[in-house]
Curated annotation (Swiss-Prot):
Protein name: Putative uncharacterized protein BUD26
Organism lineage: Eukaryota, Fungi, Dikarya, Ascomycota, Saccharomycotina
Keyword Membrane set for record: yes
GO cellular component: membrane
Transmembrane segments: 21-43, 68-87
UniProt-annotated location(s): Membrane
Keyword annotations of the record: Membrane, Transmembrane, Transmembrane helix
Other observations noted: Partially overlaps SNU56. Disruption phenotypes caused by deletion of this gene may also be a result of a defect in its overlapping gene.
Domain of life: Eukaryota
Main location: membrane
Membrane topology: Multi-pass membrane protein
GO terms for biological process, alphabetical: cellular bud site selection
Record flagged with keyword Transmembrane helix: yes
Knockout mutant characteristics: Diploid deletion displays a weak budding pattern phenotype in a systematic assay.
Length: 95
């Protein structure tokens, strides 16, 4: 619904249909990527909780923690992508 509202507002501001569809596609892609990243982090958290009780799996737990660090870096890159898309939208509205 948010995307439909955004597309409606964009059309009212005389943005071409091609630009509107590109913006909506970028936002949809961003949200789907974020949703996948959150699912992966939830699975990793679940695995950490399952293995933390077992003393033999300390090495495995450290590997998963490193994996979580990589996923956090990916989320930071995703947020940077969001800022770039937002900046591009603002620049297009100014011109």
């Amino acid at each position: 619904m948010i995307l439909i509202f955004f597309a409606y507002i964009s059309r009212r501001e005389t943005v071409s249909q091609r630009q509107t569809s590109t913006i909506v596609y970028n936002i949809t892609l961003m949200f789907s990527t974020l949703r996948c990243a959150l699912k992966i982090l939830a699975q990793i958290k679940k695995r950490l909780q399952q293995t933390s009780s077992n003393h033999e799996n300390k090495k495995y737990e450290e590997v998963i923690k490193d994996h979580v660090g990589v996923k956090i870096q990916n989320i930071i890159c995703l947020l940077a992508f969001v800022l770039v898309v937002y900046y591009q939208m603002r620049c297009k509205k100014m011109t």
